[in-house]
Design a protein with these regions (language model features):
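Short intrinsically disordered, low-complexity coil segments enriched in acidic
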Residues: 1-2, 287
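Glycine-rich ThDP/TPP pyrophosphate-binding loop and its adjacent helix/strand module
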Residues: 57-58, 65, 113, 117-300, ...
């Protein structure tokens, strides 16, 4: 039902307000959630999905799609709204079930590629790190198959993300590796749950990220979609540095009594304040109503996405004819094909094993045996390659200038390593492992838990798993870690006793 309308409101502003109020309506109906960030960041989401990203709502698994990460997972109502409007498999009824058990619209996004949700986010900073892993995957592929693999990693990050240590670890690594396909828009609204950022977060974010080696675009008006689009396109031109776009926004934008305050963050606006916000933004539509012209405008993403995918398929066919060997290699990676007969050969080798040795040495040997059969196996360690035996021999180190290396030097960044590895797994093309000492599993527990929750196939290697590590003292002696890991649902924990069990753990 239309109450009153501002005739001067263009279709883009109308679509943005639709995103705002669909988000507000979801939170109001659930009587819980976070309306503030969606109201402030709606222009960013609109710009990305409607004007920038290469994506096909009717085939969310399109291999060369741009990836989008909502690192501020509490703003999930905005993600569901934009996916619904652009033609993904979300209905208004799904939006009305926001935060309900068993719905498509849980309180924080849960990975489901068929719905357009690339990663599970909620614990702040995790999505930020996941995007770095996705960019590593993209760079590995595009460095060799650039004619058909070429996509960006976009994300909306927030003040809370940037306060988390994992984001610092991942940002530092991304700058070091020159991951130019990362473009993050920082929803800089200056508010956290406790209040103004002046209470706990006064650092100069721009200088910090420049020090990491990022290109930074400062003081961008988060309401100006033309400026946002222009800035993102400028960022795309820099393939040597990840980009951070600092978009100044207002939490709870449009709400007369809550905009710009922490009260807009984590509780419903309520029906009375929602009506005031509608009046303030001259929005005359009823609850969960989508204007017909907005529906038509946003669903244009379907046609444009299908056209882009068709172009890509034609490109793949041309590439297959002109580069059959490279195409076959890439096809095996994209489809995760193993070399035929690999399991039989592995079992034969396992039957020949008799000599006793440390299981970390056995693990290293297993890795190098399996790499011959699994062309998409990559990995590294948190600055403990020699100790954890995690080097793929004769394969080089992945770096800014050598992006074909299969060994990733994560640095002393255990938590970041976990989040980045999850991003590599979520990208969908590589099997990734990462190693450190068992006692340091505590540093990366949140990433391990999210990997299990997301049903990713990330492989975590933990060595030095005994109190027999006496000389290093109690700081390095794992006591509770093994039991702690075994309590995580969906996490398969193997603790092999010998060489054969180690190899078969890897096979499993």
């Amino acid at each position: 039902m239309v109450i009153s309308l501002n005739k001067s409101m263009n279709i883009e502003q109308k679509a943005i307000n639709t995103l705002r109020f669909l988000s507000v309506d979801q939170v109001n109906k659930a009587n819980s959630g976070h309306p503030g960030a969606p109201m402030g960041a709606a222009p960013i989401a609109y710009t990305l999905f409607k004007k920038i990203m290469n994506h096909n709502p009717k085939n969310p698994n399109f291999q060369n799609r741009d990836r989008f990460i909502l690192s501020i997972g509490h703003a999930s109502a905005l993600l569901y709204s934009v996916l619904c409007l652009t033609g993904y498999d979300f209905s208004i009824e799904d939006l009305k079930k926001f935060r309900q058990l068993g719905s498509k619209t849980p309180g924080h996004p849960e990975r489901d590629i068929d719905l357009g949700i690339e990663v599970t986010t909620g614990p702040l900073g995790q999505g930020f790190a996941n995007g770095v892993g996705m960019a590593i995957s993209e760079k590995m592929l595009s460095s060799k198959y650039d004619k058909i693999i070429n996509h960006n990693i976009y994300g909306i990050v927030g003040d809370g993300d940037l306060q988390e240590g994992i984001a610092s670890e991942a940002a530092s690594l991304a700058g070091t590796l020159g991951l130019g396909k990362i473009i993050y828009i920082y929803d800089s609204n200056g508010i956290s749950i406790d209040g103004s950022n002046e209470l706990a977060f006064t650092e100069n974010v721009s200088q910090r990220f420049k020090a990491y080696g990022w290109e930074v675009f400062e003081d961008i008006d988060g309401l100006d979609i033309k400026l946002l689009e222009k800035t993102i396109l400028n960022a795309k031109n820099n393939l040597d540095q990840p980009s951070l776009i600092i978009a100044n926004t207002t939490i709870g934008y449009g709400s007369p009594n809550k905009a710009g305050s922490e009260s807009a963050h984590g509780e419903p606006l309520g029906l009375e304040e929602t009506e005031l916000a509608k009046q303030n933004l001259d929005w005359g539509y009823s609850e969960f109503e989508i204007p017909e012209d907005v529906k038509k405008h946003m669903l244009e993403c379907i046609e444009s996405g299908m056209i882009e995918e068709e172009k890509w398929i034609e490109l793949c066919d041309e590439y297959k004819n002109s580069n059959p060997k490279e195409y076959d290699e890439l096809n095996k990676i994209l489809n995760k094909k193993l070399i035929p007969g690999w399991d039989k050969e592995i079992l034969e080798k396992a039957s020949e094993i008799n000599d006793p040795e440390a299981t970390r040495a056995s693990s290293g040997a297993s890795i190098n045996l399996l790499t011959d059969y699994i062309p998409n196996l990559i990995g590294g360690s948190a600055d403990l390659t020699g100790s954890t035996n995690t080097e793929i021999k004769n394969s080089g180190n992945f770096s800014k200038n050598i992006p074909t290396g299969r060994n990733i030097k994560f640095g002393v960044r255990e938590h970041g390593m976990g989040g980045v590895m999850n991003g590599i797994s979520a990208h969908g093309n590589f099997r990734v492992f990462g190693g450190t000492f068992l006692v340091f599993a505590d540093y990366m527990r949140a990433s391990i838990r999210l990997s299990a929750l997301s049903k990713l196939n990330t492989i975590f290697i933990f060595t030095h798993d005994s109190i027999g590590l006496g000389e290093d003292g109690p700081t390095h002696q794992p006591i509770s870690q093994l039991m702690s890991l075994r309590t995580i649902p969906n996490l398969n924990v193997f603790r092999p006793a010998d060489k054969k069990e180690t190899l078969m753990s890897w096979v499993s």
